[in-house]
């Protein structure tokens, strides 16, 4: 459970700043478009003068946007399909929770723990520093903390 102060800080300050800074960077190169997922999936395609700004701020926006999308005021159940995929990848839901918690608590400093779908279609737990996104590694994030 999260407290209101933490959520307000992350939504109204951090996320809003990432959006503003990503937009400011994109304005310098309108020719590259505005699809952050496509751009961050191929960071070398981003002009050098705005690359790090988009990695940091575009990643921050995408990471937070997924996080907000996943939040719910009520408890939700894992679908049978997802539960089966988790059991196959990690052995059990309890093992998944342990590994995911370890990824989250093992990150020194700021960053994210992720459940991702790899290019091969399997589930994987990973962690990224700061506002780096697994999209840049060719992975599709489906759970973020």
UniProtKB/Swiss-Prot annotation:
Binds 1 Mn(2+) or Fe(3+) ion per subunit. One of its GO terms (cellular component) is cytoplasm. Destroys superoxide anion radicals which are normally produced within the cells and which are toxic to biological systems. Catalyzes the dismutation of superoxide anion radicals into O2 and H2O2 by successive reduction and oxidation of the transition metal ion at the active site. GO terms for molecular function: metal ion binding; superoxide dismutase activity. Its EC number is 1.15.1.1. It comes from Streptococcus iniae. Belongs to the iron/manganese superoxide dismutase family. This is Superoxide dismutase [Mn/Fe]. Keywords: Iron, Manganese, Metal-binding, Oxidoreductase. Mn(2+) binds at residues 10, 64. Fe(3+) binds at residues 10, 64. InterPro entries: Mn/Fe_SOD, Mn/Fe_SOD_C, Mn/Fe_SOD_N, Mn/Fe_SOD_N_sf, SOD_C_sf. The lineage of its organism: Bacteria, Bacillati, Bacillota, Bacilli, Lactobacillales. The keyword Iron applies. Its cofactor is Mn(2+); Fe(3+). It catalyses: 2 superoxide + 2 H(+) = H2O2 + O2.
């Amino acid at each position: 459970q999260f407290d209101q102060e933490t959520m307000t800080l992350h939504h109204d300050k951090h996320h809003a700043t990432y959006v503003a800074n990503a937009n400011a960077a994109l304005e310098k190169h309108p020719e590259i478009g505005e699809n952050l997922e496509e751009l961050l999936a191929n960071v070398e395609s981003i002009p050098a003068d705005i690359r790090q700004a988009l990695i940091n701020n575009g990643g921050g926006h995408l990471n937070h946007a997924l996080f907000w999308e996943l939040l719910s005021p009520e408890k939700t159940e894992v679908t049978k399909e997802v539960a089966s995929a988790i059991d196959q990848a990690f052995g059990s839901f309890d093992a998944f929770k342990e590994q995911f918690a370890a990824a989250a608590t093992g990150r020194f400093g700021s960053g994210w723990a992720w459940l991702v779908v790899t290019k091969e279609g399997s589930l994987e737990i990973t962690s990224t520093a700061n506002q780096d996104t697994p999209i840049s590694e060719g992975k599709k994030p489906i759970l973020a903390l």
